[in-house]
Amino acid sequence: MDAEPFVVVGGDAAGLSAASKFRRTAPDREVRVFEKGRWISYAYCGMPYFIAGRIDQLGDLLSLSPAAADERGIDLRRGHEVTAVDPNEGVVHVESDEGGESNEGGESIEQPYSALLVATGGRAATGPFDVRELDGAFTLHDMDAAAAIDAYIADPESYDPGRVADTPVDRERVKYNAAQPAPETAAIIGGGYVGVEMAEALRERGLDVHLFQRSGHVLQPFGKAVADRVETELAERGVTVHTGTPVDALRGEERIEAVAFDGGEIEVDLAIVGVGIRPNTELLDGTGIELGDSGAIRTDEFGRTNLDSVYAAGDCATARHTVTGEETWMPLGLTANRSGRAIGATVGGEETPVGDIAGTAVVKAFEMECGRVGLLDEESAREAGFDPVRETVTAGSRSGYYPGNAETDVTLVADRE
């Protein structure tokens, strides 16, 4: 039996999936999870629907409570930030905050490990915008942000703080945003998954919404045929879509007042910046860890890095694409959970490959639902050695005589041979 615990850095999807599987695989061994924040294991994809008002309680998005983690035999330490990794000594350096658990507030810890999983996730990219400078400017990157946006949108006289009850939310931030005048016009910068779903959410809350996309169409991974349908749906629902229109600046003194772009500016009192995410890998600077072209941690078929006994999973790690066989980075929840479980089994003594990924994703735009899988980008297909052909067909979603039948567009990309 290993004298030192299996140490996990990060208490979200990949980290807690790994810890849970490890405990099932090796019930006599110890696993310790360090999470620098207060939140663990929540449904990121559900946050736009909380903001829309379709989900009443923020706590409904929590997948695993600290009490449930304890019942699984997981030594979970929230409020504990791993600040450095020493792979030569096999230890991590940890700082606990004033509200930390299982430790005196502010104390430093040197924690040895038998194996280490880095599951530090990703963070919202902001491009040239510093959303911290202006009230009413946000990124939707965690549960505190979702709660703050929801509070900011609400009328100060009618905001219900019960929507965030029984959660570790930043209550001062919520209180501050709930006291602001309710916005009327919103700009969403970025037409990816978050941008499209937030456009729906904000329209449902009664705002005038402008969606800005730098490239020629929204939802780049889905291709133009799907994007055209989505843009039509957004427009019919009252969203003004600005494609091929990069936003240059957020204007305002203390509160967001306008977004500026080539050719003009639009007055707004809410801005959501959703221009992608970046992997959190700075923790491993100076360790000799290998990173992929995306900046994510390079891993093999079992989630192992080039450092001895160090694994990586989730939004901070690469994976292999099932179509091309090449290294890729697709920060999606399904990938994080699956790779975490596989690594937990491997470290527990049952070597399990993390599996290739096919890039499966779904997104909803009002009443339109879109899904994708595989390799849709023809340029990438050519780079992978294929001779791609593309075709879009329209068919019924079910037999024509059955109620609810609707048109379904399917875009297929195949190798010519």
Which residue stretches match the model-derived regions?
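FAD-site-proximal beta/loop scaffold in flavoenzymes
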Residues: 133-177, 254-258, 262-345
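Haloarchaeal acidic low-complexity proteome signature biased toward cell-envelope/secretome components but also
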Residues: 1-6, 13-16, 21-27, 47, ...
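A Rossmann-like FAD-binding core segment of flavoenzymes
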Residues: 28-30, 76-105, 110-111, 205-299
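Beta1-alpha1 glycine-rich phosphate/pyrophosphate-binding loop at the start
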Residues: 1-75, 196, 200-222
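Rossmann-like NAD(P)H-binding beta-loop-alpha module
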Residues: 144, 148-226, 237-239
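Conserved N-terminal Rossmann-fold NAD(P)-binding element of oxidoreductases
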Residues: 9-10, 118, 189-190
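Nucleotide donor/acceptor-binding cores
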Residues: 4, 29, 115, 135, ...
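Mid-to-C-terminal Rossmann-like scaffold of FAD/NAD(P)H-dependent oxidoreductases
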Residues: 319-416
